[in-house]
Amino acid sequence: MRNTLSTFLSLVLCVLSASGQQLAKLPRLSGPVQLDGPSNEPAWQTIPSLSLTMFSPTYRGSPTESTEIRIAYDDDFIYASGRFYDSEPSGIRATSLVRDMNSPSDDIFCLVVDSFDDNENALGFTTSALGNRGDFTVYGDAEPRDGPPFNESWNTFWDVAVVRTDQGWFAEMRIPFSSLRFQDDNGRVGMGIIAWRYHPRKNEIVISPDIPPNWVWGFMKPSRAQDYVLDGVFSRNPLYITPYVLSGAGHSSELNGDSTAYLRSSNSPREAGLDIKYGLTSNLTLDLSLNTDFAQVEADDQQVNLTRFSLFFPEKRLFFQERSSLFNVTMGGPNQLFYSRQIGLSEEGPVRLFG
């Protein structure tokens, strides 16, 4: 019995030791850095670059271009820097400055952060050689169901700077901890992180950590992220207030009573409202909306429907974006358990909320 117990305890210690080896301490910056792209400050020089592996087109093949990616943090931000060298800098591709408009033909730098370290959900941040920003959420461990497992309508607050030279292009990201949701244990935080570079001319993806291409979206998969420990970081309760004011002018002309002249009238409609977002805890966010103006939301893509079935349009209203992945439950096939765009609607049209 004693030998059996000793063997069991040895196995437990081996498992704990093996799991502990998977954790890495994310390096902390030793000084200030300027968000300008090159990442040549002394504080960056002490941060080791990540070990990168070719993800595609040949798993663990030899990359054709040199890449250096570094990730670090301080009390308020997570930083990521990338040096993307290119032997033909004139061939670097970037097509748009519009947010969330990264093209498959663009050179891309991406950071995926599983801030809760739950191996299920993550936040993605991308930039191109032009310095545009793309942000999205990943849900369902990046396993496709009825489409890509992303919500590209999600936006948050963060910054990026990019510079191009005759050696390639260089980028720096700065993501506030207030834009991330996470739980801390007396200032100790665990997060999963994936970083990769996409080189479109050669269809190459180099990635950290080493992830095999066994899944369609393996380079976005939270359960395959490298687990990091951050010390001295505490969850934040940010308050965001977004007011809006709308005004217009209208003119009309109507015949008078005896139809001898036109009476001109004018009106100036005005409308105001605001949205408030407050993080009560790391798991609970309060969203308030006063006189919501959903007309200011990005318009849906036009589609032609020649069937008797309704079209599916993605949710783009920020009010419904917070942790929306919790409701992404499918029922098999094209059916979806919860679809926020149908709130207040029936087959006959809008539903009266009062009166």
Regions of interest found by a model, annotated:
Residues 6-15:
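Bacterial N-terminal signal peptides
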Residues 20-355:
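Structural preference for beta-rich elements and adjacent junctions enriched in aromatics
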Residues 1-4:
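Positively charged n-region of N-terminal signal peptides that target proteins for export
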